[in-house]
Regions:
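ATP-dependent phospho-/nucleotidyl transfer catalytic cores
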Residues: 26-30, 55-56, 62-66, 124-137, ...
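Amphipathic alpha-helical segments that form well-ordered structural scaffolds
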Residues: 11-12, 78, 145, 196-203, ...
Length: 371
């Protein structure tokens, strides 16, 4: 994916139905996944200014970008309709896709780059770190509210933008294949870690089977539930809307809950080499669970609430499986900074899994009390 020139960006902007002419283009972010620009326009007849988020979607990661955009349009329009019914802010409460002048939600340029545009959400900020249980509870409430607003949307209408993303059963099968291949000749040095995972093989089908049987309902899932994907009001610090919707797809609410717990209820970074510093933090789990359930406003089933601890456990185990599998394959998927990086990552996740197992009775008792 090549970075565009300023002239190319202006050409693309002219294809979209923007208000006024472009007067400023500012790069935003590090371009790790998508190239992003903040574009300012001005209407000459009234000197009104508007801002837009203009992006190139990384089609190396998202192979079917039209499906990604259809998902985003479905979800944001559903949320906006609910905001409108309730008399809430339809401009800031969810992302607004800007269409091209010929009525499409994207534009592909001569270089094959796939462009999209959102209205910029004004007077908001992003924060990167969770510094307290209270902050984590607010993150939980925001993502719980996302579930609530989409609880009456038919998730089966969405495409699976990354197939089998949280199919832990398949992730485990892929891991066993990596062990058998031993492509990098590393399996002999990680037998303890391999055994830890294989001893928990039956756990991998827990959520997948519950979805298949109907024990858990199919829901819209965000799949990247971190603080930086919540826009906060710059004055009140209250959550305004959820962003980064590229991985929105059908799944279980436990996936989103578990993804937050895996990182937010850990005492250290996922690549902390000193395992004595790595602990699961029950108080952070409890804070997030309270916020999440409050945000859902009763949209979760009793079974979903009771299985919230399983969400944190399974997603953490799944990530350990992925890290260790990539280590065995010779680090072909995750970017690494040193030869043992993926192994270090896997070990932190396995330490969290072990800690969660020890805390599981306490966690189950806590969520049962929230029903």
């Amino acid at each position: 994916m090549t970075q565009p020139t300023n002239e190319e960006i202006l050409h693309v902007c002219d294809r979209f139905d923007l208000c006024g002419r472009v007067i400023k283009v500012k790069p935003c972010g590090d371009g790790h996944i998508n190239y992003t620009y903040i574009v300012t326009t001005r209407r000459d007849d009234c000197d009104c200014r508007c801002r837009y988020t203009v992006q190139i979607v990384n089609t190396d990661i998202f192979k079917k970008p039209d499906e990604v955009m259809e998902n985003i349009v479905h979800v944001t329009e559903h949320i906006r309709a609910g905001l409108r019914r309730n008399g809430e802010d339809t401009e800031r409460g969810t992302l607004r896709v800007v269409y091209t002048k010929d009525g499409k939600y994207s534009y592909t340029d001569g270089e094959g780059r796939y462009w999209r545009v959102y209205r910029f959400v004004e007077d908001t900020v992003c924060r990167q770190t969770v510094d307290s249980p209270a902050t984590f509870a607010r993150v939980g409430e925001a993502f719980g509210d996302f579930q609530r607003r989409l609880s009456d949307f038919d998730a089966s209408l969405l495409y699976e933008s990354i197939p089998n993303f949280h199919n832990t059963q398949k992730r485990y099968a892929d891991f066993l294949s990596a062990v058998e291949r031993d492509a990098a000749g590393r399996a002999h040095g990680v037998q303890e870690e391999i055994r830890f995972i294989t001893d928990r093989a039956e756990k991998c089908s827990l959520i997948v089977d519950a979805l298949a049987s109907g024990e858990l309902p199919l829901r819209v899932t965000h799949n990247d539930t971190k603080l930086s994907n919540i826009l906060l009001d710059e004055t009140t610090d209250e959550a305004v809307c959820i962003i980064d919707l590229d991985t929105v797809m059908p799944g279980s609410a436990l996936y989103d809950f578990g993804d937050s717990i895996r990182t937010g209820a850990a005492s250290a970074a996922e690549d902390e080499p000193d395992l004595d510093k790595v602990h699961f933090l029950p108080e952070m789990f409890k804070a997030y669970a309270e916020g999440f359930i409050k945000g859902t406003g009763g949209a979760l089933t009793e079974r979903e609430v009771r299985m919230l601890p399983d969400g944190g456990y399974i997603i953490t185990l799944e990530q350990a499986i992925r890290f260790l599998g990539d280590y065995l394959d010779g680090d072909t998927y995750y970017h690494t900074k040193y030869p043992e990086h993926n192994l270090v990552r896997a070990r932190t996740q396995l330490k969290l899994v072990a800690d969660m197992e020890a805390c599981m009775p306490e966690l189950r008792e806590f969520v049962d009390g929230l029903i």
